[in-house]
């Protein structure tokens, strides 16, 4: 069994969302885009009560719920084996769910099976309202007969068939939250560990009873109250007690409360590396500590698989605290063993491990959450450019798409220069740069690698996923042609930037060097092994090094080491960032608006070097 669709209404920052989920999906997006909201909506629907914290006003959209405010989540579940409602009486009956049929290709539901709608499905709902007089949320889980006629689940005339937790346990939904640094996951203090022990093994009752007896009645000579340094204190206390109480109680010191529960609660996980000492989990690295919950859940999943039960696992940020090779191993293992995995991540490496149709970019604007696949379907014979973006450069593409704006430059060298300059600039920040002077481009603008000047193709792919694609082109006829190819797109690029007439990125680098021309020509000549008589000579040389990364990095380091060049580069990059982020109201002397090419939806600028 697995979840194929999720609808959310009125939950936290999301007023509405309709999300299609595959067997193994990764949710990618910037901070506060709604990834955790999706995961916790699933926990509300399918998780145990302890899996989700108590709902408050802030869980309702707008954080100020009135009597009519509702949280509503509806999930569609399919994957029943066999594909016949008669074999699943716990899900389908007059007192339970209504059978529906799902079309895997069209991703729609039907009341009856047909050539498209072939997979048996059921819909589960969760609703919540905030009771103002009691200052707490009232919740309900139920089977959904018909979304269109559902109405208010809390209405007096609403006749809903509630769903019991035991039925939901058949789906086997488990959540691994991003916060997983508790060091006692593998101990009897953990409910999950107790459940795994009950499922996969047996309680070590005999060993616990023996340990309890030893702790309760320690052998003579080992009792703490008889040890030097303590015996005098204990003896004096006993003398006082004899004088005060007829029963003359005697003080004894024990390591636990001496019942079975206290023995179990005192168990602490330890780990030994090779021949090294055995150390408690709290003395281990954070990576090992954070893996404990996953280790337990994998054992739980194995037990469910052995009995033919499904196992759906939602994992927030699996990349936390572990190295890239372990990230790949972990994610691949989860995808191989679970019926369904739902992963959230900020790591391009983790996101790139999922196929393009299962890489969902999450974005929330004005309360509407969208989840768009990177590309679905992927062409059977992708173009050379699509191969580079979707396969060879998927990490770079995913990383760029996580930004507020996405910039599509004319070529790979533009990407290399922008990244090199921004990195070198950031490495020369001072304490005074925390405010308006801080370099902002890399924070808010992601740059997509573009080969062979395939701006139109790249724009088509990016605009299908991201709401803020922009383009950067050279100031020549070819650049104008690339602009003409995308300006009629629907929607068009939000912002377009031209370099000056006849300029490419290399001219811009020479312009930055011109802030202290004589010193920079000498320094760059030494670093690059070529003397430069003037700025034009530097530009000509850089144009021959378009794909040579050492030149980009060396030149950027030299330039950003000079205060005048650093100030000029910061002015340029921050002005570019301002134009791309808010082209409607951007006002900077370095970029002038081209009114003849601009429209209400597309703002065109040209760089004007000062």
Residue ranges and their predicted role:
Residues 25, 77-81, 128-132:
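Beta-strand elements of well-folded, non-transmembrane domains
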Residues 47-70, 306, 342, 367-369, ...:
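Flexible phosphate/Mg2+-sensing switch loops adjacent to catalytic phosphate-binding sites
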Residues 165, 395-408, 412-610:
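Acidic, Mg2+-coordinating catalytic modules of nucleic-acid enzymes
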Residues 1-47, 270-399, 599-610:
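Switch/communication elements of ASCE P-loop NTPase nucleotide-binding domains
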Residues 40-118:
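Conserved P-loop NTP-binding catalytic core
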Residues 185-187, 191, 195-292, 296-312:
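Extended helical coiled-coil dimerization/tether regions that scaffold
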